[in-house]
């Protein structure tokens, strides 16, 4: 082996390995202190790009879960208020049935009407004041709004909150009253016992209800027979013996037409009026009877929307479960790419520390090699 002074190859080699060991040690310390094995693009360019995309997705999923929970909270708030609306309507129905009883005097019916009016005011107050985050929910101003329940655009679900005020047309319908009142001596005549009711239902289908009453039936029995043949309209009789037919706006679209022998004899079709829970009047037998049909239509409308809100809440609960599952898997994938394996990294750091110490020792010895040339000069 040649002995030279100008170039110490052994020292250069030891220096190179020392630098490598120190660099590896610094990398291990950075990974252990940060908790990430990718701290810059130079560590793993592709891994950094993938982990950043996964991080964006994870953050979006977190926001989506919060949005879905807000949607559930809004639905719960609205549904809770509507539960009280249902209770009020049921009480109003009880009072209407009570007022329809023949044992009540005019004064008693007026007293019942006072409670009905107070309940109606409270129903409207609930609709006007129920809110979430300053947004009114049940007075018809909320409408349909979208809830972002995904990590990307285009993953929204619509929620519509309907008007629960008592003057909303869906909280009532149209009342048709016969022009001619029939007393207890009136009976359905043979040959004039047919009544055809033509209408369009809420699904847009044209319907014809053919009533063939039994000859000899009185006006109350006729109303009972009509109610037994269909649930699209409700028939009742007022205190003057006039037949009343109510068509709820939640069941019937547009006008109802009447034809047949009974239609002509009773004078059905010309006298009609729009009625809602806000207009019910139980101070008369006819008004009380009609009020029952109006409130039944309102209850169906409210309960139908409550069912929609219940389905919305269940859907969002499942959406949250799915989002949590996706987020868990996304974070697991990101962790495998970016997070430090402490067991592996501490082993690597120990190795680099040992190599650094060994390289330092060898470098010190390599630096002494040129001194051997002095002994040759004697």
Swiss-Prot record:
Its main location: secreted. One of its GO terms (molecular function) is structural molecule activity. One of its GO terms (cellular component) is bacterial-type flagellum. It is found in: Secreted; Bacterial flagellum. Pfam families: Flagellin_C (PF00700), Flagellin_IN (PF07196), Flagellin_N (PF00669). The keyword Secreted applies. Keywords: Bacterial flagellum, Coiled coil, Secreted. Residues 103-128, 311-340 form a coiled coil. The keyword Coiled coil applies. Heteromer of multiple flagellin subunits including FlaA, FlaB/D, FlaC, FlaE and FlaF. Flagellin is the subunit protein which polymerizes to form the filaments of bacterial flagella. FlaB/D is not essential for polar flagellar synthesis and swimming motility. Homomer of FlaB/D is not able to form a functional filament. This is Polar flagellin B/D. It comes from Vibrio parahaemolyticus serotype O3:K6 (strain RIMD 2210633). The lineage of its organism: Bacteria, Pseudomonadati, Pseudomonadota, Gammaproteobacteria, Vibrionales.
